[in-house]
Amino acid sequence: MASRRVLLKLSGESFGGGAPLVDPDVVSAIASEIVRVSKTIQIAIVVGGGNYFRGAELSRRGMARDRADYMGMLGTVINALALQDFLEQAGGDTRVQSAISMSQVAELYVPRRAERHLTKGRVVIFAAGAGMPYFSTDTVAVQRALEIKADIVLIAKNGVDGVYTDDPQINPNAKKIYKITYREALERGLRVVDSAALGLCMEHGLPMRVFGMESLRDAVSGLKVGTELSQ
């Protein structure tokens, strides 16, 4: 029986524990959780860069959107290298693949090569987003999941444990949704995950689970935590 293969999306904010830059203790704890479950599950990871730069936010403040997005992509490379280091300290075997060529620190992203790494038990970390501006890392996570034939996309969120009817940090009456279709999520304008990412999943029948960082190991292991999204 083939191993379960998952694509895990980690937000940049999770690397700083909600603060800017990288908190070594936080990343070490994340890495330890991943290594524990990587013995029996093939894990690929897309990392965000929001703890350094957010392209959309920089653009709103007057910077050219494409340049701002490239800055965000470079932030994801920093996070990928930090995660790689702590994964290896915890005993994991890893590879970083970047969508932008930087051969001194990462392989160039090649889907077939990534699949080979996964079958050999390596944790593969995808960096630099899509290598092009105007794509969120949520959307890139779905693209990568489709390309490496992952069974599910797991979206780990910092500060929220699933999809809600409204922003729970603003509206205390917001209700958690445990299961929802992509079409309903799009029609209701639920914004926890990028709409382009939801549309891609809906088009290709790829399941998704959105959950809080505290449930990372359970989500990767296949337990029903957070919110399940499907067709």
From Swiss-Prot:
Keywords, ordered alphabetically: ATP-binding, Cytoplasm, Kinase, Nucleotide-binding, Pyrimidine biosynthesis, Transferase
GO cellular component, one term: cytoplasm
Chain residues that bind ATP: K9, L10, S11, G12, G50, R54, N158, Y164, D167
Involved pathway(s): Pyrimidine metabolism; CTP biosynthesis via de novo pathway; UDP from UMP (UMPK route): step 1/1
Family, per entry: Belongs to the UMP kinase family.
Assembly with partners or alone: Homohexamer.
PANTHER family: URIDYLATE KINASE, URIDYLATE KINASE PUMPKIN, CHLOROPLASTIC
Name of this chain's protein: Uridylate kinase
Organism expressing this protein natively: Tropheryma whipplei (strain Twist) (Whipple's bacillus)
Biological classification of the source: Bacteria, Bacillati, Actinomycetota, Actinomycetes, Micrococcales
Gene: pyrH
